[in-house]
């Protein structure tokens, strides 16, 4: 395994990272308490990808490969965008790498990167959806990005893997069969299209599985059919499956990578994000608790709000009836926008793919209007933000904010 030495990483990073003149004084790296809390920020530059660690996201410090404990992970993620095919689960990173090797990594001593396990699949494997509400510390429940179209059955066969996190063995696999449409859609020129299914969400609620999915064209490589489709079946038997659909908001938003576009509220109502083809007009549909069909009396039109403009971050349930759909805090049940975090931070944009919650507070990274990167803490109870650690201005993207321990 090719893991670069930390010293070489820091020397190489010096050439292309610059520090703001008003940045915190970080002549000496912050010591890492080996038994205390540890957090990480996954950042990329034009030349590579780095894990930056800190004992606190809210301290007045600069997170940088030059002055902090940056870990060069470029050799494991051959392109920066592959961070969307990586996930942090209970302090361990799971990486799809180049699709040939699915790896488990840990940050050791706050400054080293170690592969602790790996799993090879028979075919290319890129990490898809994570069913976080049924995953545990011992078992990660996940999918791969692309299922298999069975033309004889006219279904998409989508496996769900139950992986033992101790040794990365597969405890079991469930194969969901999602029925495809029974007609052939047309292209704009009137010719027949060639559609395929992309699962956009996987949610288990009680004894039901809900699989949001959309259609794309093999010919144009674009999203098609402005209808939200969700496959509902019994769980875990997968029996009694049916398709429910709703055209009010367009197709079920998202793609097959990890980003999460559905959420359960405090009442266990399931919300499904929708989007119009060829636009950035989003909305929310609802499947009420105990129901297996869309609520005909509910649609939250978000076309006037540029959700996900610069971010495809995970939707977070904040509690007290609120949810974070970057960059907005919403009260979905009452169809209200509670806050715009871009305004609360004083101007900026979130550009992450993975934020996280701790002790009832949201942590996300924003690039301010002054082109400075900061971690911000949002308190849903008080509707206020606090600015935390600064991230080196030499980065061009921050993908993940994670807690490692």
Model-derived segments and spans:
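Bacterial Sec-dependent N-terminal signal peptides
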Residues: 1-40
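Intrinsically disordered, low-complexity segments enriched in Gly and acidic/Ser/Thr residues
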Residues: 30-34, 289-371
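Repeated scaffold domains used in trafficking and secretory/extracellular systems
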Residues: 76-88, 122-137, 183-185, 195-201, ...
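Short, solvent-exposed loop/turn segments at conserved positions within beta-propeller repeat blades
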Residues: 45-50, 98-101, 150-158, 220-227, ...
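Beta-propeller fold detector
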Residues: 62-77, 113-125, 169-188, 240-249, ...
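Post-signal peptide N-terminal segment of secreted/secretory-pathway proteins
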Residues: 51-162
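Acidic, serine/threonine- and glycine-rich low-complexity intrinsically disordered segments
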Residues: 181-327
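Beta-propeller blade signature
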Residues: 53-60, 155-169, 223-238, 282-292, ...
């Amino acid at each position: 395994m090719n893991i670069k030495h930390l010293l070489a990483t820091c020397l190489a990073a010096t050439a292309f990272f610059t520090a703001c003149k008003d940045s915190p004084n970080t002549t000496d790296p912050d010591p890492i308490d080996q038994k205390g809390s540890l957090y990480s920020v996954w950042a990329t530059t034009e030349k590579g990808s780095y894990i930056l660690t800190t004992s606190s996201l809210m301290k007045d410090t600069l997170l940088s490969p030059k002055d902090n404990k940056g870990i060069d992970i470029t050799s494991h993620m051959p392109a920066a965008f592959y961070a969307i095919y990586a996930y942090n689960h209970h302090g361990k990173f799971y990486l799809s790498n180049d699709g040939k090797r699915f790896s488990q990594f840990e940050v050791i001593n706050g400054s080293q990167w170690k592969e602790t396990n790996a799993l090879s699949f028979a075919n290319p494997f890129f990490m898809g959806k994570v069913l976080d509400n049924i995953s545990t510390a011992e078992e990660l429940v996940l999918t791969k990005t692309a299922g298999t179209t069975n033309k004889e059955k006219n279904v998409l066969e989508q496996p769900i893997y139950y992986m033992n996190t101790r040794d990365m063995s597969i405890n079991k696999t469930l194969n969901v069969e999602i029925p495809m449409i029974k007609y052939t859609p047309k292209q704009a020129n009137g010719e027949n299209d060639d559609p395929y299914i992309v699962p956009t969400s996987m949610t288990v609620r009680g004894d039901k599985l809900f699989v949001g999915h959309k259609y794309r064209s093999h010919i144009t490589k674009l999203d098609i059919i402005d209808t939200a489709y969700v496959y509902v079946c019994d769980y875990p038997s997968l029996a009694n499956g049916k398709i429910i659909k709703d055209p009010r908001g367009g197709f079920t938003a998202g793609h097959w990578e990890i980003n999460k576009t559905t959420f359960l509220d405090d009442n266990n109502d399931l919300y499904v994000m929708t989007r119009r083809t060829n636009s950035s007009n989003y909305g929310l549909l609802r499947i009420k608790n105990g129901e297996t069909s869309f609520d005909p009396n509910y649609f939250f039109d978000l076309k006037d709000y540029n959700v996900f403009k610069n971010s495809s971050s995970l939707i977070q349930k904040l509690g007290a009836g609120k949810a974070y759909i970057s960059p907005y805090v919403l009260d979905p049940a009452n169809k209200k926008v509670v806050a715009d975090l871009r305004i609360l931070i004083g101007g900026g944009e979130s550009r992450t793919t993975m934020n996280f919650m701790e002790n009832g507070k949201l942590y996300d990274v924003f690039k301010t209007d002054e082109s400075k990167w900061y971690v911000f803490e949002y308190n849903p109870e008080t509707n206020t933000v606090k600015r935390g650690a600064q991230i080196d201005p030499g980065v061009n993207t921050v993908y993940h904010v994670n807690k490692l321990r």
